[in-house]
Amino acid sequence: MLPWKKHKFELLAEAPPRQASKPKGYAVSLHYSALSSLARACPEGALSRVGSMFRSKRKKLHITSEDPTYTVLYLGNATTIQARGDGCTDLAVGKIWSKSEAGRQGTKMKLTVSAQGIRMVHAEERALRRPGHLYLLHRVTYCVADARLPKVFAWVYRHELKHKAVMLRCHAVLVSKPEKAQAMALLLYQTSANALAEFKRLKRRDDARHQQQELVGAHTIPLVPLRKLLLHGPCCYKPPVERSRSAPKLGSITEDLLGEQQEEELQEEEEEHLEDCLEEEEEEDGVGDGDPAEEEAEAQRALVVAMQLECEDLLDPLENGHEEALGDGGVSLGPSSGTSLPLSVCASDMKAQLSQLISDLGDLSFGNDVSTLETDLRVTRLLSGESTGSESSIEGGGLDATPVSPGNPSGPADSTSLDEPYSG
């Protein structure tokens, strides 16, 4: 239709309405009426709800920080006979201190405290090719920041030799400040406690799973997902037995046919000899039979006497142990005593003491006061990674008045040939 002029205005034909273009891809188109209805229904939280529709979910992940590393001067080690207890390292630390000429001789090392244990590597660049040393956490029985020598940190390690032999050695290192030695001792104690608790938790979970498999069946209980194993990783507190030096080495079994035949012949001869002996005893019993009632009475009397003797043997150690435990209070458990405790009470007390002793075997004994060190600001700053003066808390600078002797570059490899080699 052609346009025409009227009263100086141009009137044009209306163009056909354009069709709305379809959304491309996965774009979401929201209508204005839907938004307006949502705003009218929820006037307060409309904007926040609309924004939450397009907001991505955020998660916070805690990245494991690196294990703290300290620059120390390794003084050496000495044998000891006490695995734990107050003052168990005094004599050994004294020997090490005198042997190192009051801390003037030693090897500069990098000491790292981790969930596996204490790892030491050489700090000098020329000695980096030498193998390091790893002291496994479950074999460390005692650690202390020495009170007589405040800058000395010592620990007792249970070395395992061949044929399941055990040797206790006390190791000592010298640091630059007393609070640094205290921080190292507290860190080792806390790491050991946490690792032991995690080891017990995983052990209880595995035991419960094995019990369920025995009751219900091995195929009905699902295995632990591989994702969970990779996420948590293996427990580092106690490595598998295969890594132990005292573990038996398994080899191939060679079958000997001649030896098997000889063993079978010997076994047959022993069985024949045993049958002949039994036949002879039966013949002798048949010849000398007496009154069966008298024999039965004698057997009953012998059984009663044997039971009395066994009961006395069992009661004697229980009574003696409880008398020693209650000796200070003046309570006697003998036959002439007027005061007596039931046997069940004694047995329960001994069982509780035994369970407590077993539970304490894996705990690391600490030679310092935990509460005092945890409230010390200098120690907590060192553990948190803050600097306390001219030297960094994690990567120490030099050692005050403790020069490294050039005549002893070997370090703990010469004196501690029993250490576990550090791999990696």
Swiss-Prot record:
Coiled-coil features, chain-numbered ranges: none
Species annotation: Mus musculus (Mouse)
Family matches, as InterPro entries: Adapter_Engulfment-Domain, FAM43A/B_PTB, PH-like_dom_sf, PTB/PI_dom
Biased composition (Low complexity): 382-394
Stretches the record annotates as Disordered: 261-299, 382-424
Compositionally biased region (Polar residues): 405-418
One Pfam family cited in the UniProt record for this chain: PID_2
Residue spans of biased composition, Acidic residues class: 261-297
Entry's family note: Belongs to the FAM43 family.
Domain of life: Eukaryota
Descriptive protein name: Protein FAM43A
